[in-house]
């Protein structure tokens, strides 16, 4: 995996260029969404409550809630790459087919 400082702070994708001087984001969409702190916390808490200690596919989890897929997968990437609350089974970029679970403490 890449270093955390080379990823977008909203969606967790690898940065190829920076769009903002204030935030580390990959697109103008992420730049506008990263300012919505309450929405980010709400989506993150929903994602954490959906997960368990067994492996689950991102696509299956996203079908259980009514959240935009981009925001849902972005939340999962933030929780894997930055917060270390979730973990991914594979060491590749997280997508809809990736398997994730909660980190055992």
Model feature map: region roles:
Residues 67-78:
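Short amphipathic alpha-helical interaction segments
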Residues 1-4, 16-20:
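Short, flexible, mixed-charge glycine/proline-rich loop motifs
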């Amino acid at each position: 995996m890449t270093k955390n400082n080379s990823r977008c702070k909203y969606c967790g994708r690898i940065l190829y260029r920076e769009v903002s001087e204030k935030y580390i984001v990959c697109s103008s969409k992420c730049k506008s969404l990263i300012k919505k702190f309450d929405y980010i916390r709400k989506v993150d808490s929903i994602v954490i409550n959906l997960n368990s200690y067994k492996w689950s596919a991102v696509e299956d989890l996203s079908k259980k809630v009514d959240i935009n897929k981009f925001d849902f997968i972005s939340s999962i990437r933030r929780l894997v790459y930055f917060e270390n609350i979730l973990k991914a089974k594979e060491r590749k970029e997280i997508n809809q087919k990736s398997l994730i679970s909660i980190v055992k403490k």
